[in-house]
């Protein structure tokens, strides 16, 4: 069976790109464990050295979406997440943003995983906060219904990735796999804010989101960070209504002070959970500012506000009046509930 992939590998070795059909079929085969580990490693390394195309990223994400376990729901959900891999070890920003967004009235399907290169991934800090990260589909839906936010544990929804996970770990460098998490939300989010770890991915990821059916999405990179940042300038590629727009954002433009990276540097899950709890309890400072900026982007992408500055103001209000804290409490309760309403059924 593995001989069937040799022509495709030869094409990649010659520096050629794969069309979407070939890329999707190959990646689907990877998710079934058909190519050998050496063949998978060769393919993704060749793409990395040449530079992954929008078509290849889109096709691989499409194959991964098809293999996923999906969460059924009636809502227009939003996801805020990053590719990871920026190496800055910040506090959990997009996780905190999820609670602010939910507190502000959005339905948030937060897709995430345990830490790979950081000290504390979304799953790690949520577990430290008391969330059942292994919640069933019914519990996830119950959380979305009642708290406005659910957590979709990537390793549970994308079980087919078990075939390539050891290869990723053995390679030890970024490949196309690192881009796919934010592009494969199991709840089918069509509104997204996606942070990327390097400038070169800003535009391709936005285009891939558009090709995958996003209605409105931002792909962002902020001064080395896979978030909108208050430490400098953020590059944004916005996909909206079938077209792409590129622009930059500074914290000063939306009324926020500039911060030093040291002010938002995190630690282990317990440390980051304590910081997130303090944030939801009303603590002011650089962590609050960067969370408000990213939450503002979520509100804007979801058409909840008309300007980013208005989004910052809404985020501050949600933190101050306890709505964000209530969203966390609701997520903890729903994911640990042993009795889920009968009308909530898995997809």
Curated annotation (Swiss-Prot):
Query: What's the gene?
Result: trpD
> Which residues participate in anthranilate 1 binding?
82, 113
From the record, give the transmembrane residue ranges.
Answer: none
Q: Which organism is it from?
A: Caulobacter sp. (strain K31)
Q: What does the cofactor section's free text say about binding?
A: Binds 2 magnesium ions per monomer.
Q: Broadest EC class?
A: transferase
GO BP annotations, alphabetical order = L-tryptophan biosynthetic process
Name of this chain's protein? Anthranilate phosphoribosyltransferase
Which terms are listed as keywords in the entry? Amino-acid biosynthesis, Aromatic amino acid biosynthesis, Glycosyltransferase, Magnesium, Metal-binding, Transferase, Tryptophan biosynthesis
Q: Which reaction does it catalyse?
A: N-(5-phospho-beta-D-ribosyl)anthranilate + diphosphate = 5-phospho-alpha-D-ribose 1-diphosphate + anthranilate
